[in-house]
């Protein structure tokens, strides 16, 4: 369901999106004193060389997030660019891809497209791309794995915060729980939220209006928790 964000909602640590990267983790690799265990001898470097095959797997996953606005009729003019989803892991192990147990909230940009046909109905759509390490305490993606979340923190919910701008200059952030969508596609996918704009009253006044923006004061740069 859709809830209006209130100031007393618990906001987890705030992060920007991680860059996309991949890693390989070959197992059971040993240093041997038997030349027969190597592939060839490098005459120039004077060392025995063994080729190691490794499959690069993603350590960062991509979600495409779309907020479908039905019955807008020009009421909502855009988003503020401070869209965020909470409940994602704040770090990962580069070798194993196993994510940590520290939930965070990740920001991403959204842009508005108007008069788009969605499931046979015309709507405005606010959409954006989100990159994340995935959910907390989660195994990495492998080709044979399923996308359903099997980690140890299913109680950590995911909330989508969408700051909306209205035609009278006011703003309001709505909150939608997207836990089921995130846990059913924990290695990335498409998150879709449908909103009937006729059920959202336009805030009175002008300018900032009645708005909750999930940010913090006295911001300082924080490094991601990435284990080697």
Language-model regions, residue ranges each:
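Residues at beta-strand starts and edge strands
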Residues: 48-50, 59-63, 79, 156-160, ...
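Hydrophobic, glycine-enriched assembly/anchoring segments
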Residues: 187-228
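Short, low-hydrophobicity acidic/polar segments
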Residues: 1-59
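A short, Gly/Thr-enriched small/hydrophobic beta-strand-prone motif that recurs across taxa
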Residues: 55-70
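Tryptophan-paired
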Residues: 1, 76-184
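Primarily extracytoplasmic ectodomains and periplasmic/lumenal surface modules that are beta-strand-rich
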Residues: 72-74
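N-terminal compositionally biased, intrinsically disordered segments and leader/signal-like regions
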Residues: 13, 174-176, 193
